[in-house]
């Protein structure tokens, strides 16, 4: 008789997570998603995917090709005809458009000002989501963005919604942006963050929302290392609790969802308790 555990179980390193684990991280601009996502990917040996960089790359290409930001068909065509790649570099990811390294260009204030409009189009998002899902076919991922838990991976193993006060986020973003642009001020950056939050949360297509089964985490008063420590143990806790006795795919979806909701409900209560709320 064939033993059930001989079926395709993912590899599971000691004190780690299965190699096909999907961790979705969503949250507004400047909430620290990239830092956290990179650290978690490193810790759990998963692939880090920055989906904001993909929308930024398309915005860069639109500028180069003089494509109007409101022309969704032309934008989608530009994306379909391109070779967009993200590679893990030593400290950050390397973004290439048709082999050209555009990693620093996509962080400029010009891109910052227009990327929300580019990301608001349904056809563009459809193509991006297809690319993002495709990446996870061959590997586990830590993917960060605005719609990862809600649209890209509604059945992600762990969903985190990362947040921080708008003042904290503005100070963080200003620190990054002022490296390339000495004229930017915290006030300007804060005004731009408020404008982008509004566009990202109020747009029709896949707006930034908190999935009901996401763990909400406010890191305004936490250091990066404190955050990593807390979230690493939360991820391990959730994964261990939801690890199936049978391969996950054999469990009815309702059972998976129930188990996950139970773990997330408990974690959100714990987080509120730790945050004194
Ligand atoms: O995270 P970021 O600042 O690099 O994102 C750039 C823009 O892309 C941001 O305005 C929202 C948009 N975005 C999105 O709509 N969906 C995603 N999954 C990721 C980013």
Protein language model regions, located:
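Extreme N-terminal, non-catalytic leader segments
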Residues: 1-22
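Small-molecule kinase domains that catalyze NTP-dependent phosphoryl transfer to phosphate-bearing small molecules
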Residues: 10, 87, 132-139, 146-151, ...
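Hydrophobic anchor at the beta1->P-loop junction of P-loop NTPases
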Residues: 25
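P-loop (Walker A) phosphate-binding loop of NTP-binding proteins
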Residues: 28
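Conserved lysine of the Walker
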Residues: 33
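Hydrophobic positions on the alpha1 helix immediately C-terminal to the Walker A/P-loop
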Residues: 36
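N-terminal phosphate/diphosphate-binding loop that engages ATP/GTP or pyrophosphate donors
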Residues: 43-107
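ATP-dependent NMP and nucleoside kinases share a basic, alpha-helical "lid"
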Residues: 103-180
